[in-house]
Amino acid sequence: MERTGRKRRAISWYRGGPPFTKTLGAAIAEIASMLIKGKCHCGNIAFSLTWEPEPAEIPARACTCSFCTKHGGVWTSNPRGALEVVVKDPRLVSKYAFGTRTAEFHICARCGIVPIVTSQIDDHLYAVVSVNAFEGLDQSRLRRASAGFDGEGEESRLARRKRNWIANVTYVESGT
């Protein structure tokens, strides 16, 4: 590597294509992650979302379907993230599906909160999490917007979820 003037140190990367070079700062920014924790009100359904790379803003989609409108559902996801869901008492989790029945809302039967929604697509579990269930996150980082999916066909809906929802999901029922 040639060093002249004030050039930054570079790192070579290989990602299945031709090698390319990035500055050290750009490489670190890309791999830096943010851990977001959340849970239902009583803590029976808890999650840890590793968001990579760490976002300047977090998209928060206020779904306009009848269920989310009545429940105040505002969801986020990062397809590059990793989600771990831990359920303390699975007997206190109710899963609700409606409409196309392609998603399950995980409702805590003790406190009534819906911290996650999952969708099983091609034998793979995808998820979104409720921003209202976040613990300790600065709410000014949320970029809120409405999201309406009425009239969306099932094939389009599942393709959108595969693109946009969290694909790395671990769901653990720990029991009591």
Question: Model-derived features: where do they sit?
Answer:
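Residue-identity detector for glycine
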Residues: 5, 16-17, 25
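Coiled-coil-like amphipathic alpha-helices with heptad-repeat character
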Residues: 1-4, 10, 156-158
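A short Gly-Trp-Pro
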Residues: 23-39, 44-176
